[in-house]
Design a protein with these regions (language model features):
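Acidic/histidine-enriched, beta-strand-rich ligand/metal-binding domains
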Residues: 1-64
Length: 64
């Protein structure tokens, strides 16, 4: 997992082979997301606000 600069998210991991993303929140919980396209992961990692991108694009989607 790669540490990120965010007030809510601590780290993000992504496996392009399985399209599985893991997001670890600063509160301690880690969530898995399945079927995440590579461009969504790249968008998250390059977003000006990782938390806002997560809320807009990932949250409540890509459930495993």
């Amino acid at each position: 997992m790669i540490p990120v600069r965010s007030s809510a998210i601590a780290a993000v991991g992504y496996d392009p082979t399985t399209r599985r993303m893991k997001i670890k929140f600063k509160q301690g919980r880690t969530y898995d997301f399945c079927g995440v396209p590579p461009e969504v992961y790249q968008g998250l990692m390059s977003a000006g606000s990782i938390g806002s991108y997560y809320d807009r694009v990932i949250r409540d989607r890509y459930q495993c």
